[in-house]
Amino acid sequence: MGSSGAGKTTLLNTLTFRNNGNIVSGQRAVNGIPINSTTLSSLSAYVQQDDLFIGTLTVREHLVFQALVRMDPQIPYSQRMIRVEEVIKELTLSKCQHTVIGTPGRIKGISGGEMKRLSFASEVLTNPPVMFCDEPTSGLDSFMAQNVVTVLKSMALKGKTIICTIHQPSSEVYAMFDKILLMAEGRVAFLGSPDDAFNFFKGLGASCPSNYNPADYYIQLLAIVPTQEEACRDHVDMVCDSFERSEQGIKLTAVTELSGDLQAKAMLSSWGETWQGGVANRSPYKASWWAQFEAVLWRSWLSIKKEPVLIKVRLLQTLVSMMETLFSFGQYKLTEEISSLSELCHRGRIFQ
């Protein structure tokens, strides 16, 4: 959590190897075991802030396509469909499973909350132990946002680690988080439970009022106000320095120092070797190129047959292209040579 420009998305992208253009120091590790981008991709899922779907597909058809191209090839088709059913029930998508996803301004489809849950469902299919979510409540009203976070909370209670950036959560949503990381100017202002955050800021003489949303209060407290930049930055430095000297900050520093020799821990771990030597060397693609081709062909056919006008337009386009090709090349023999540049341009004008 943090105000705009605090570094939330930058940190999330750094953790997931998505900002290779910037200089990053340090090491990424899971349970004390160092990982690379390929290993992390096989262990985690990333839910983008913007939802990208084929609007003519139904919710079920979209999930079936995802199961065909993203699940392990050793899993039979019947088991994949069972997993699709489980995910539909888990993400409460049963009522809209046969509804088209829709395209804003063009095709009426499912609601914003259902679309966001469908994004989670697409990633949960492979049952990843870690999930990264970039602004999962963006563009949703408070009720829909609470429903989305409730889904994330239920997944966390089943053993998954959910890491997300969030902007201006309601007090109900804020209370659902197990841990919060407050950021300001790229620094850690606080890391711990919501109750510990209240006690920490109370110790600084900035106790959150009883009738105030804690999330809004902390974000405003750490924001950089225009025309008051210098004073705000001094205040932010004071809060961040105070956290480093606090009990939680000292514990965090100790954990970091104990995890310094990550390579040694990996050698002592029986499953760390598997992560580094096995998973890291696997292909990033679950399905073969032929399986991907079949799945994409099936998806394209579903999309086209649901739009009769599109079929007519593409048929007309094909006929026009065929006639143009016939007109350009039909009068020449295969053995003829091109004698001039103008003739070459004339023959190839269809491709311009």
What are these regions (language model features)?
Residues M1-S4, Q27-V30, V47-Q48, F65-L91, ...:
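Topological signature of polytopic alpha-helical transporters
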Residues F17, V24-S42, G102-T103:
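Conserved ABC transporter NBD signature motif
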Residues T9-G21, S122:
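Short, conserved post-Walker A segment of ABC-type ATPase nucleotide-binding domains
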Residues S142-M144:
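Helix N-cap at the start of a conserved alpha-helix in ABC-type nucleotide-binding domains
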Residues A6, N36-T38, D50-E61, Q74-I75:
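Conserved catalytic motifs of ABC-family nucleotide-binding domains
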Residues M131-E135:
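Catalytic Walker B motif of ABC-type/P-loop ATPase nucleotide-binding domains
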Residues V124-P129:
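A short, proline-enriched helix->beta-strand linker immediately N-terminal to the Walker B motif
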Residues F120-A121, V148:
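Hydrophobic anchor residue at the start of the ABC signature
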